[in-house]
């Protein structure tokens, strides 16, 4: 049962599944990347974080600190590292993307994460968002991913970045949630669904919050904040405006 729907601001900058970046494949490109050391990459990353804060996208010191602790270049393949500071999605395996930094920041600010919260992420992707979540809750994060290639990609990235024992990557259908670790204070979904999956509502604590894009299969959804009001799964929905994510595939999402 839905109590009410509130419309919030429209998010103008949305996710794009095919980022318009001119990726060079020549020898000079690889030579350039190899000559860049981590300090160069981190300086670029710091400038992006400062820009997101200046634009009012990063609002809290906690989210800013997490972004500075977990730079995106640690979660992309070598050929994309020099683009990690660009505020656009980047390709990752299985035809998916790592989200644009502004979109990740928007969702983390809306999540209002606190130390000790129990959080499930649906759509592990590269592992970057899960690492950010860990820095905001300081408790093991559970993230579920249906694409086996991405499960391995996320696990390797997380291990290299020092999060092997801090994030548990599960291979499975995220639209079913992960009952063994429920109930959750927060569930964050990083793909677009046709509707809010009922199992995710059921696995929230009363007062818990679910963030999920809901709408069409490609290119247009609305970012919904779903708050569970009671044990009968009565919910309140806030609409945070237009976004565009890859489709959420599963029994309670889109069919392949």
Where are these regions (language model features)?
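Substrate-binding/catalytic lobe of Class I Rossmann-like enzymes that use SAM or dcSAM, i.e.
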Residues: 222-256
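Class I SAM-dependent transferase core
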Residues: 35-120, 128-132, 136, 150-161, ...
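Short hydrophobic targeting helices and cationic amphipathic motifs
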Residues: 19, 23, 30-31
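Conserved nucleotide-cofactor-binding alpha/beta core module
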Residues: 112-236
């Amino acid at each position: 049962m839905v109590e009410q729907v509130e419309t919030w601001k429209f998010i103008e900058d949305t996710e794009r599944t095919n980022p318009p970046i001119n990726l060079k494949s020549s020898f000079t490109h690889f030579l350039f990347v190899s000559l860049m050391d981590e300090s160069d990459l981190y300086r670029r990353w710091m400038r992006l974080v400062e820009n997101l804060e200046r634009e009012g996208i990063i609002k809290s010191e906690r989210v800013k600190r997490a972004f500075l602790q977990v730079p995106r270049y640690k979660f992309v393949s070598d050929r994309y590292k020099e683009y990690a500071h660009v505020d656009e999605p980047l390709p990752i395996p299985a035809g998916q993307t790592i989200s644009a930094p502004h979109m990740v920041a928007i969702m983390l600010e809306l999540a209002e994460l606190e130390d000790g919260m129990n959080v499930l992420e649906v759509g592990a992707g590269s592992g970057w968002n899960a690492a950010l979540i860990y820095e905001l809750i300081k408790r093991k994060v559970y993230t579920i991913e249906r694409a086996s290639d991405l499960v391995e990609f996320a696990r390797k990235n997380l291990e290299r970045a020092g999060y092997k024992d801090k994030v548990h990557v599960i291979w499975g259908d995220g639209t079913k949630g992960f009952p063994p670790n429920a109930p959750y204070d927060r569930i964050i979904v990083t793909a677009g669904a046709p509707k809010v999956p009922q199992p995710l509502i059921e696995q929230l604590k009363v007062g818990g919050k679910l963030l999920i894009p809901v709408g069409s299969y490609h290119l247009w959804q609305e970012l919904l904040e779903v708050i569970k009001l009671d044990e009968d799964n009565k919910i309140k929905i806030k609409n945070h405006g237009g976004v565009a994510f890859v489709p959420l595939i599963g029994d309670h999402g889109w069919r392949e």
